[in-house]
Protein backbone atom coordinates (compact mmCIF):
# COMPACT_ATOMS: atom_id res chain seq x y z
CA UNK A 1 0.00 0.00 0.00
CA UNK A 2 1.35 3.44 -0.96
CA UNK A 3 1.60 5.98 1.85
CA UNK A 4 0.76 9.58 1.02
CA UNK A 5 3.34 11.88 2.61
CA UNK A 6 2.57 15.60 2.74
CA UNK A 7 5.57 17.85 3.41
CA UNK A 8 5.11 21.44 4.56
CA UNK A 9 7.45 24.27 3.61
CA UNK A 10 6.98 27.93 4.45
CA UNK A 11 10.26 29.52 3.36
CA UNK A 12 13.50 29.35 1.39
CA UNK A 13 15.78 28.18 4.20
CA UNK A 14 13.38 25.46 5.28
CA UNK A 15 12.99 24.18 1.72
CA UNK A 16 16.76 23.97 1.34
CA UNK A 17 16.87 21.69 4.37
CA UNK A 18 13.96 19.56 3.17
CA UNK A 19 15.05 19.04 -0.43
CA UNK A 20 17.14 15.89 0.25
CA UNK A 21 14.11 14.38 1.98
CA UNK A 22 11.83 15.27 -0.93
CA UNK A 23 14.26 13.64 -3.35
CA UNK A 24 14.25 10.43 -1.30
CA UNK A 25 10.45 10.34 -1.04
CA UNK A 26 10.10 10.75 -4.82
CA UNK A 27 12.29 7.72 -5.58
CA UNK A 28 10.49 5.54 -3.02
CA UNK A 29 7.95 3.30 -4.78
CA UNK A 30 5.84 2.93 -1.64
CA UNK A 31 5.50 6.66 -0.92
CA UNK A 32 3.60 9.44 -2.70
CA UNK A 33 4.83 13.00 -2.18
CA UNK A 34 2.47 15.94 -1.74
CA UNK A 35 3.76 19.46 -1.09
CA UNK A 36 1.94 22.09 0.96
CA UNK A 37 3.64 25.41 0.20
CA UNK A 38 2.96 28.62 2.09
CA UNK A 39 4.44 31.58 3.94
CA UNK A 40 7.34 33.46 2.40
CA UNK A 41 7.39 31.18 -0.65
CA UNK A 42 4.31 32.98 -1.98
CA UNK A 43 5.39 36.53 -1.13
CA UNK A 44 6.95 38.78 -3.77
CA UNK A 45 8.77 40.60 -0.98
CA UNK A 46 10.66 37.41 -0.17
CA UNK A 47 11.35 36.41 -3.75
CA UNK A 48 8.39 34.17 -4.69
CA UNK A 49 10.60 31.19 -3.91
CA UNK A 50 7.91 28.63 -4.70
CA UNK A 51 9.27 29.04 -8.24
CA UNK A 52 12.57 27.54 -7.05
CA UNK A 53 10.66 24.49 -5.85
CA UNK A 54 9.02 24.10 -9.24
CA UNK A 55 12.34 24.68 -11.02
CA UNK A 56 13.71 21.73 -9.06
CA UNK A 57 11.01 19.55 -10.61
CA UNK A 58 8.56 19.34 -7.72
CA UNK A 59 4.84 20.06 -7.85
CA UNK A 60 3.39 22.53 -5.35
CA UNK A 61 0.19 20.55 -4.76
CA UNK A 62 -1.33 23.15 -2.43
CA UNK A 63 -0.44 26.83 -2.07
CA UNK A 64 -1.77 28.67 0.95
CA UNK A 65 -1.19 32.43 1.13
CA UNK A 66 -0.95 33.74 4.67
CA UNK A 67 1.74 36.45 4.96
CA UNK A 68 0.42 40.01 5.36
CA UNK A 69 2.43 43.05 4.23
CA UNK A 70 3.36 43.97 7.79
CA UNK A 71 5.60 42.46 10.44
CA UNK A 72 3.96 43.66 13.65
CA UNK A 73 2.98 41.10 16.27
CA UNK A 74 -0.70 41.66 15.49
CA UNK A 75 -0.11 41.14 11.76
CA UNK A 76 1.71 37.87 12.39
CA UNK A 77 -1.18 36.70 14.57
CA UNK A 78 -3.55 37.52 11.70
CA UNK A 79 -1.27 35.63 9.30
CA UNK A 80 -1.44 32.62 11.60
CA UNK A 81 -5.23 32.80 11.50
CA UNK A 82 -5.23 32.84 7.71
CA UNK A 83 -2.86 29.90 7.72
CA UNK A 84 -5.12 27.88 10.00
CA UNK A 85 -8.03 28.32 7.60
CA UNK A 86 -5.99 27.51 4.51
CA UNK A 87 -4.04 24.58 5.96
CA UNK A 88 -7.12 22.81 7.28
CA UNK A 89 -8.77 23.05 3.87
CA UNK A 90 -5.61 21.91 2.07
CA UNK A 91 -5.12 18.93 4.39
CA UNK A 92 -8.75 17.95 3.89
CA UNK A 93 -8.13 17.81 0.15
CA UNK A 94 -4.79 16.00 0.35
CA UNK A 95 -5.74 13.53 3.11
CA UNK A 96 -2.14 12.51 3.87
CA UNK A 97 -1.11 9.50 5.94
CA UNK A 98 1.74 11.50 7.49
CA UNK A 99 2.37 15.26 7.59
CA UNK A 100 6.08 16.21 7.74
CA UNK A 101 7.05 19.51 9.37
CA UNK A 102 10.56 20.86 9.95
CA UNK A 103 11.63 23.36 12.55
CA UNK A 104 9.93 25.98 14.61
CA UNK A 105 8.57 28.97 12.73
CA UNK A 106 5.08 30.34 13.28
CA UNK A 107 3.96 28.98 9.91
CA UNK A 108 5.01 25.48 11.01
CA UNK A 109 3.26 25.92 14.35
CA UNK A 110 -0.02 26.68 12.59
CA UNK A 111 0.42 23.79 10.16
CA UNK A 112 0.99 21.37 13.04
CA UNK A 113 -2.07 22.68 14.88
CA UNK A 114 -4.26 22.19 11.81
CA UNK A 115 -2.96 18.65 11.37
CA UNK A 116 -3.60 17.83 15.04
CA UNK A 117 -7.21 19.00 14.83
CA UNK A 118 -7.65 17.10 11.56
CA UNK A 119 -6.22 13.97 13.27
CA UNK A 120 -3.31 13.61 10.87
CA UNK A 121 -0.06 12.15 12.32
CA UNK A 122 2.79 14.66 12.30
CA UNK A 123 6.46 13.78 11.82
CA UNK A 124 8.55 16.62 13.24
CA UNK A 125 12.15 17.29 12.23
CA UNK A 126 14.58 19.16 14.53
CA UNK A 127 12.65 19.10 17.78
CA UNK A 128 14.24 19.34 21.22
CA UNK A 129 16.52 22.23 20.33
CA UNK A 130 16.81 25.47 22.27
CA UNK A 131 16.88 29.08 21.09
CA UNK A 132 16.25 31.20 24.17
CA UNK A 133 16.10 34.51 22.31
CA UNK A 134 13.44 33.57 19.79
CA UNK A 135 9.71 32.91 20.08
CA UNK A 136 10.47 29.91 17.87
CA UNK A 137 11.66 28.16 21.05
CA UNK A 138 8.10 27.88 22.37
CA UNK A 139 6.72 27.07 18.93
CA UNK A 140 9.21 24.22 18.58
CA UNK A 141 8.27 22.58 21.88
CA UNK A 142 4.56 23.00 21.09
CA UNK A 143 5.05 21.28 17.72
CA UNK A 144 6.82 18.45 19.54
CA UNK A 145 3.76 17.86 21.70
CA UNK A 146 1.53 17.78 18.63
CA UNK A 147 3.72 15.27 16.78
CA UNK A 148 3.79 11.48 16.65
CA UNK A 149 7.29 10.93 15.22
CA UNK A 150 10.38 12.93 16.08
CA UNK A 151 13.59 13.20 14.05
CA UNK A 152 16.16 15.01 16.19
CA UNK A 153 19.72 16.02 15.34
CA UNK A 154 21.71 15.16 18.51
CA UNK A 155 21.38 12.88 21.53
CA UNK A 156 21.03 15.94 23.76
CA UNK A 157 17.95 17.00 21.81
CA UNK A 158 16.56 13.46 21.97
CA UNK A 159 16.74 13.58 25.76
CA UNK A 160 14.89 16.88 25.77
CA UNK A 161 12.05 15.51 23.62
CA UNK A 162 11.76 12.60 26.08
CA UNK A 163 11.68 15.15 28.90
CA UNK A 164 8.69 16.73 27.15
CA UNK A 165 6.81 13.47 27.60
CA UNK A 166 7.42 11.77 24.26
CA UNK A 167 8.13 8.02 24.19
CA UNK A 168 11.73 7.09 23.26
CA UNK A 169 10.57 4.54 20.66
CA UNK A 170 9.08 7.38 18.62
CA UNK A 171 12.25 9.51 18.65
CA UNK A 172 15.07 9.01 16.14
CA UNK A 173 18.47 10.72 16.03
CA UNK A 174 19.65 10.66 12.43
CA UNK A 175 21.52 13.97 12.50
CA UNK A 176 20.71 17.16 10.59
CA UNK A 177 19.02 16.47 7.29
CA UNK A 178 20.83 19.18 5.35
CA UNK A 179 24.36 18.50 6.57
CA UNK A 180 24.71 15.13 4.89
CA UNK A 181 23.22 16.44 1.66
CA UNK A 182 25.45 19.53 1.55
CA UNK A 183 28.58 17.38 1.47
CA UNK A 184 27.37 15.73 -1.73
CA UNK A 185 26.77 18.94 -3.67
CA UNK A 186 29.50 20.06 -6.05
CA UNK A 187 29.94 23.80 -5.47
CA UNK A 188 30.23 26.39 -8.20
CA UNK A 189 33.72 27.51 -9.07
CA UNK A 190 34.75 30.78 -7.48
CA UNK A 191 34.63 32.59 -10.82
CA UNK A 192 31.19 31.18 -11.68
CA UNK A 193 29.84 32.13 -8.24
CA UNK A 194 31.21 35.66 -8.60
CA UNK A 195 29.53 35.90 -11.98
CA UNK A 196 26.17 34.71 -10.67
CA UNK A 197 26.12 37.05 -7.66
CA UNK A 198 27.84 39.89 -9.54
CA UNK A 199 30.31 40.37 -6.70
CA UNK A 200 34.02 39.64 -6.34
CA UNK A 201 35.11 37.60 -3.32
CA UNK A 202 38.15 39.08 -1.64
CA UNK A 203 40.43 37.53 1.00
CA UNK A 204 38.34 39.07 3.82
CA UNK A 205 34.77 38.38 2.72
CA UNK A 206 32.10 37.60 5.31
CA UNK A 207 28.52 36.35 4.98
CA UNK A 208 26.05 38.11 7.29
CA UNK A 209 22.62 36.76 8.24
CA UNK A 210 20.92 38.51 11.15
CA UNK A 211 17.35 37.94 12.34
CA UNK A 212 15.18 39.75 14.92
CA UNK A 213 15.36 38.54 18.51
CA UNK A 214 11.63 37.96 18.62
CA UNK A 215 11.25 37.65 22.40
CA UNK A 216 12.51 41.21 22.86
CA UNK A 217 10.64 44.41 22.06
CA UNK A 218 12.03 46.95 19.62
CA UNK A 219 15.67 45.80 19.60
CA UNK A 220 16.09 44.85 15.94
CA UNK A 221 17.25 48.22 14.61
CA UNK A 222 19.68 48.88 17.45
CA UNK A 223 21.15 45.36 17.43
CA UNK A 224 21.73 45.29 13.69
CA UNK A 225 23.17 48.82 13.72
CA UNK A 226 25.72 47.62 16.27
CA UNK A 227 26.80 44.89 13.86
CA UNK A 228 27.14 47.37 11.00
CA UNK A 229 29.22 49.72 13.16
CA UNK A 230 31.50 46.85 14.15
CA UNK A 231 32.00 46.01 10.47
CA UNK A 232 32.83 49.66 9.75
CA UNK A 233 35.35 49.80 12.59
CA UNK A 234 37.17 46.69 11.38
CA UNK A 235 37.35 48.03 7.84
CA UNK A 236 38.63 46.35 4.67
CA UNK A 237 35.83 43.77 4.70
CA UNK A 238 33.66 42.63 1.84
CA UNK A 239 30.17 41.70 3.00
CA UNK A 240 27.44 39.50 1.54
CA UNK A 241 24.10 40.05 3.29
CA UNK A 242 21.19 37.63 3.17
CA UNK A 243 17.97 39.21 4.36
CA UNK A 244 15.82 38.20 7.28
CA UNK A 245 12.66 36.09 7.45
CA UNK A 246 9.08 37.32 7.87
CA UNK A 247 9.54 37.79 11.61
CA UNK A 248 8.35 40.66 13.77
CA UNK A 249 10.47 43.75 12.89
CA UNK A 250 12.29 41.87 10.13
CA UNK A 251 11.63 44.72 7.71
CA UNK A 252 13.60 47.07 9.95
CA UNK A 253 16.71 44.95 9.42
CA UNK A 254 16.09 44.56 5.70
CA UNK A 255 15.72 48.33 5.28
CA UNK A 256 19.01 48.88 7.12
CA UNK A 257 20.69 46.34 4.83
CA UNK A 258 19.42 48.15 1.74
CA UNK A 259 20.61 51.51 3.05
CA UNK A 260 24.05 50.15 3.99
CA UNK A 261 24.56 48.50 0.59
CA UNK A 262 23.45 51.70 -1.14
CA UNK A 263 26.11 53.62 0.80
CA UNK A 264 28.80 50.94 0.29
CA UNK A 265 28.21 49.60 -3.24
CA UNK A 266 31.82 48.55 -3.91
CA UNK A 267 32.26 46.15 -1.02
CA UNK A 268 28.73 44.94 -0.17
CA UNK A 269 25.88 43.07 -1.80
CA UNK A 270 22.50 41.86 -0.50
CA UNK A 271 20.14 39.05 -1.44
CA UNK A 272 16.63 38.17 -0.40
CA UNK A 273 17.67 34.56 -0.98
CA UNK A 274 20.94 33.13 -2.28
CA UNK A 275 19.38 29.76 -2.99
CA UNK A 276 20.93 26.49 -1.89
CA UNK A 277 23.60 26.14 -4.58
CA UNK A 278 24.92 29.69 -4.28
CA UNK A 279 24.75 29.53 -0.48
CA UNK A 280 26.75 26.30 -0.28
CA UNK A 281 29.23 27.60 -2.85
CA UNK A 282 29.63 30.83 -0.89
CA UNK A 283 30.56 28.86 2.23
CA UNK A 284 33.50 27.37 0.30
CA UNK A 285 35.09 30.74 -0.49
CA UNK A 286 34.33 33.19 2.33
CA UNK A 287 36.43 33.92 5.39
CA UNK A 288 33.67 33.87 8.01
CA UNK A 289 29.95 33.77 8.73
CA UNK A 290 28.53 36.39 11.10
CA UNK A 291 25.04 36.78 12.58
CA UNK A 292 22.48 34.92 14.66
CA UNK A 293 21.04 32.31 12.31
CA UNK A 294 20.81 28.57 12.95
CA UNK A 295 22.53 27.97 9.60
CA UNK A 296 25.68 29.44 11.10
CA UNK A 297 25.57 26.82 13.83
CA UNK A 298 24.36 23.68 12.04
CA UNK A 299 25.77 24.02 8.52
CA UNK A 300 29.05 25.95 8.72
CA UNK A 301 30.89 23.24 10.74
CA UNK A 302 30.73 20.94 7.70
CA UNK A 303 32.90 23.39 5.75
CA UNK A 304 35.01 24.46 8.74
CA UNK A 305 33.99 28.09 8.24
CA UNK A 306 34.84 30.37 11.18
CA UNK A 307 31.55 31.66 12.58
CA UNK A 308 30.44 34.40 14.97
CA UNK A 309 27.11 33.82 16.72
CA UNK A 310 25.85 37.14 18.10
CA UNK A 311 23.70 37.49 21.21
CA UNK A 312 21.05 35.21 22.69
CA UNK A 313 18.82 34.38 19.72
CA UNK A 314 20.39 30.94 19.24
CA UNK A 315 21.43 30.44 22.87
CA UNK A 316 20.97 26.81 23.89
CA UNK A 317 22.05 25.10 20.68
CA UNK A 318 24.92 22.60 20.57
CA UNK A 319 27.96 24.46 19.19
CA UNK A 320 30.85 23.10 17.15
CA UNK A 321 34.38 24.43 17.69
CA UNK A 322 34.21 26.72 14.65
CA UNK A 323 31.48 28.81 16.32
CA UNK A 324 32.18 31.46 18.93
CA UNK A 325 29.40 33.37 20.67
CA UNK A 326 29.72 37.03 21.59
CA UNK A 327 27.58 39.54 23.43
CA UNK A 328 25.38 42.02 21.62
CA UNK A 329 27.66 45.08 21.57
CA UNK A 330 29.87 46.84 19.04
CA UNK A 331 33.05 46.04 20.96
CA UNK A 332 32.21 42.36 21.46
CA UNK A 333 31.14 41.85 17.85
CA UNK A 334 34.27 43.54 16.51
CA UNK A 335 36.51 41.47 18.78
CA UNK A 336 34.79 38.22 17.77
CA UNK A 337 35.02 38.93 14.04
CA UNK A 338 38.70 39.82 14.34
CA UNK A 339 39.31 36.60 16.25
CA UNK A 340 37.68 34.27 13.71
CA UNK A 341 39.51 36.00 10.86
CA UNK A 342 42.87 35.26 12.46
CA UNK A 343 45.11 32.54 11.10
CA UNK A 344 45.44 31.09 14.59
CA UNK A 345 41.69 30.47 14.87
CA UNK A 346 41.47 28.96 11.41
CA UNK A 347 44.32 26.58 12.24
CA UNK A 348 42.56 25.54 15.46
CA UNK A 349 39.50 24.16 13.63
CA UNK A 350 41.21 22.20 10.86
CA UNK A 351 40.42 18.84 12.46
CA UNK A 352 36.98 19.67 13.88
CA UNK A 353 33.87 17.56 13.33
CA UNK A 354 30.26 18.61 12.88
CA UNK A 355 28.16 17.34 15.83
CA UNK A 356 25.07 17.39 13.59
CA UNK A 357 26.52 15.02 10.98
CA UNK A 358 25.54 11.33 11.23
CA UNK A 359 25.33 10.41 7.54
CA UNK A 360 22.45 9.26 5.30
CA UNK A 361 19.97 11.34 7.28
CA UNK A 362 17.31 11.72 4.59
CA UNK A 363 17.41 8.02 3.70
CA UNK A 364 16.98 7.01 7.34
CA UNK A 365 14.06 9.39 7.87
CA UNK A 366 12.29 8.14 4.75
CA UNK A 367 12.87 4.52 5.76
CA UNK A 368 11.26 5.22 9.13
CA UNK A 369 8.31 7.08 7.59
CA UNK A 370 7.80 4.21 5.17
CA UNK A 371 8.04 1.37 7.68
CA UNK A 372 6.71 2.80 10.96
CA UNK A 373 3.44 1.14 11.96
CA UNK A 374 0.98 3.99 12.29
CA UNK A 375 -1.58 3.79 15.11
CA UNK A 376 -5.29 3.73 14.31
CA UNK A 377 -5.74 7.09 16.05
CA UNK A 378 -3.45 10.00 16.90
CA UNK A 379 -3.83 9.34 20.62
CA UNK A 380 -0.59 9.06 22.56
CA UNK A 381 0.34 8.68 26.21
CA UNK A 382 2.58 10.99 28.20
CA UNK A 383 5.93 9.36 28.85
CA UNK A 384 6.91 10.10 32.45
CA UNK A 385 10.65 10.39 33.06
CA UNK A 386 11.91 8.65 36.18
CA UNK A 387 12.94 11.08 38.90
CA UNK A 388 16.35 9.40 38.95
CA UNK A 389 16.95 10.62 35.40
CA UNK A 390 16.15 14.26 36.12
Q: Where are each of the predicted segments found?
A:
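Conserved nucleotide-sugar phosphate-binding/catalytic loop shared by glycosyltransferases and other
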Residues: 32-76
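Donor-nucleotide binding loops and adjacent catalytic segments primarily
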Residues: 53, 188-285
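C-terminal amphipathic helix plus adjacent low-complexity
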Residues: 342-390
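A nucleotide-sugar donor-handling region in carbohydrate enzymes
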Residues: 8-9, 42-44, 147-222
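Active-site and donor-binding regions of nucleotide-sugar-utilizing enzymes
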Residues: 4, 8-11, 16-26, 66-168
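A donor-sugar binding/catalytic signature common to diverse glycosyltransferases
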Residues: 101-102, 150, 275-321
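Short internal beta-strands
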Residues: 34-39, 150, 240-244
Amino acid sequence: MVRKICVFTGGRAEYGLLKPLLDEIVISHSLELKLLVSGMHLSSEFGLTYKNIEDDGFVCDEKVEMILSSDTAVSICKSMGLGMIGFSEALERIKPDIFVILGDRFESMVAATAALVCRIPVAHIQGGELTFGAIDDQFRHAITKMSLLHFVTTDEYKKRVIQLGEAPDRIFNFGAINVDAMKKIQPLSKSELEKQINFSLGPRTILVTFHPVTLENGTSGNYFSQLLKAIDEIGCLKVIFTKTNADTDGRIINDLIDLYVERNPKNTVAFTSLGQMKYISTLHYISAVVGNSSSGIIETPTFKVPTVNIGDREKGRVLASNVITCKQSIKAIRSAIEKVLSGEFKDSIKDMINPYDRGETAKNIVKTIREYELPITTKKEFYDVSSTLL
